[in-house]
Amino acid sequence: TEWLPNILTDHHEMGTNSSFFFQPGVPERKNPLISDLNQALTREIGTYHEKALNSIGSLYYSEEDYDDFFFGKASTYPDANGSIGILFEQGSSRGHIQESVNGILTFPFTIRNQLTAAFSTLEAAKNMRVKLLNYMKDFYDDQIELNPKSSDNIVFGKLKDESTVHHLADILNSHKIKFNKISEAVSYTHLRAHETHND
């Protein structure tokens, strides 16, 4: 079976003197491939975090410090795949208890904030179920429309390191990108500079 979550959360710690962060991140530092609707849904989910964190008296912030740009991050990768990725960053107690500019910070307090945000995410997912399902459906429908079948072909390979090709094939397979092994030698007449690596 395939796992396609509607929301994926990524829980981390940050510097002790910080409070609690949740996405969306800095608006100007969003990957241009992430839709405005994705950010609007992330912001709407954020209202659930606000309410929950207010109810326990915890400080928090959003739309500062952290980006939503690099797709290699656990909180951004879902955004490129029809899901909503959310990063949580909790000021770290660096053990059981530590002083901070906001007062004494304890390990149980940091756990409580992360758990509260996890529960508020579940509440948002339940209440926004139809929106999130429609968002994912529309995301995949749009990808099909934006990427019609093309007759263009890309040839890739690496003569000195076949394992690189096998690893790339694994990645392509995991994303359901179809490819075939060529059956005969290929010669090129028009190559761009980045395509002429001989190794």
What are these regions (language model features)?
Residues 1-187:
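Metallocarboxypeptidase
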Residues 154, 196-199:
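Intrinsic disorder/low-complexity detector
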Residues 189-197:
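Conserved small/polar residues in nucleotide/adenosyl-binding loops
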